[in-house]
């Protein structure tokens, strides 16, 4: 994107839902050129939650808990390296975050684990009746957040 003549080199945001929501946080935590983030129900979040009696995030690799023969110590250790919670702790940019209470793909407990790990300025929009999708109001709030961060609104 930095090689494109249309890009001003300053106004860079990451924006996405589910796996895109996860990647929006991961990229922003790794690249200081990102100025703000919009993340809807990020996947890859709190993936070890099942081991502690709560729903874990997509792709639900540990859904069978500690009883799975596939849950080797190496696997459990490696998962933490790409769990979004790990990246959210390092986020320095403002973020708009939104999720719904009825999401079975990326359960609210997993997404709140990410949100609660963020120390940068953050806004939260919870839509109780929403599942694994975004309503137009959520999208509008996300776009408005970006415009506000860039002093365009």
Model feature map: region roles:
Residues 1-18:
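Gly/Ser-rich "nucleophile elbow"/oxyanion-hole loop immediately N-terminal to the catalytic nucleophile
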Residues 16-26:
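Glycine-rich nucleophile elbow surrounding the catalytic serine of serine-hydrolase chemistry
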Residues 26-71, 126, 134-137:
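Hydrolase active-site cap/lid region
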Residues 71-87:
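Active-site nucleophile elbow and catalytic-triad environment of alpha/beta-hydrolase enzymes
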Residues 91, 96-99, 103:
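Short beta-strand/loop motif that positions the catalytic acidic residue
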Residues 93, 107-116:
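Short alpha-helix in the alpha/beta-hydrolase fold that links the catalytic acid
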Residues 101-106, 132-133:
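Acidic catalytic loop of the alpha/beta-hydrolase fold
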Residues 112-153:
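C-terminal catalytic histidine-bearing segment of alpha/beta-hydrolase fold enzymes
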């Amino acid at each position: 994107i930095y090689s494109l003549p249309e890009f001003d080199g300053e106004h860079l945001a990451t924006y996405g839902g589910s796996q895109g929501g996860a990647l929006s946080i991961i990229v922003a935590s790794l690249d200081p050129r990102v100025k703000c983030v919009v993340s809807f129900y990020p996947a890859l979040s709190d993936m070890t939650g099942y081991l502690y009696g709560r729903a874990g995030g997509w792709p639900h690799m540990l859904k069978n808990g500690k009883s799975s023969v596939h849950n080797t110590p190496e696997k459990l250790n490696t998962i933490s390296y790409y769990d979004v919670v790990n990246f959210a702790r390092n986020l320095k940019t403002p973020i708009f975050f939104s999720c719904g209470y009825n999401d079975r793909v990326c359960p609210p407990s997993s997404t709140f684990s990410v949100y609660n790990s963020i120390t940068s300025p953050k806004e939260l929009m919870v839509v109780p009746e929403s599942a694994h999708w975004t309503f137009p109001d959520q999208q509008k709030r996300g776009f408005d957040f970006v415009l506000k961060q860039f002093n365009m609104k």
